[in-house]
Swiss-Prot record:
The protein's name: tRNA-cytidine(32) 2-sulfurtransferase
Anything else known: The thiolation reaction likely consists of two steps: a first activation step by ATP to form an adenylated intermediate of the target base of tRNA, and a second nucleophilic substitution step of the sulfur (S) atom supplied by the hydrosulfide attached to the Fe-S cluster.
Gene name in the database record: ttcA
Enzyme class: transferase
Protein species of origin: Geobacter metallireducens (strain ATCC 53774 / DSM 7210 / GS-15)
Intracellular or extracellular location(s): Cytoplasm
SUPFAM superfamilies: Adenine nucleotide alpha hydrolases-like
Family: Belongs to the TtcA family.
Amino acid sequence: MEFVDEKRYRKIKNGVGRAVADFNLIEEGDRIAVAVSGGKDSYTLLHILEALRRRAPVKYDLVAFTIDSGYPGFRSDVIAAHLKEHGFSHHVEATTHYDIIKEKRRPGSSYCSICARLKRGVLYTLAQQHGCNKLALGHHLDDFVETLLLNQFFVGTLKAMAPRMLADNGATTVIRPLVYVEEREIIPFARENSFPVVCCCCPVCGKADIQRKRMKELLKELERENPAVKRSLLRALANVQPRHLLDRELQRVCEVP
């Protein structure tokens, strides 16, 4: 695919390439399942990974997966048409997640968390069924720092996301190659390259996750004083000083001569 803005494309590609090198995200012979929801982030991830694949010093394969959660009006056909046009291997998995969520969701709670858990489980299964050893997700830099703040403010844990981690099933390695890419770089990239963004059609889409929206607002406020605040928060995740934290287990480890 020829990208409209070469400078923006290279900036995003270089960010992904740096993450791949820093965290050893892609290795020789990998078969990578890429979760494609129809959103700007997952389209960007898939196209950039393909662009890197064509010139990478290691050989790897990509397989795109879309989970249809059963929300009325979800246009998986639009996603399928775009990926077919660009030669991607693609599989759509239909589920009854919407019915499960309606039954299990607590009154007043968000659809997002339970929906994400259900999708992730299906993606792990699909990855194994299709011989994929890795699963690539489209979380970008903003997602990392927002999650860090959410966990600190509302959960009381010092925790964000990992760019690379072994899934609970013990068989699939989850990778997040967009860790160094900001959302404000992805938005125009997706728009100018006419990625056919598809709404998830969740009944409360745009209304849920008020806490995450508040974190976005807070970061915007902080950026007025320090434009590099998000990247500073991301650097903090790679610059942990255990001796200066309150975790007792870490304190014991640090005291061992």
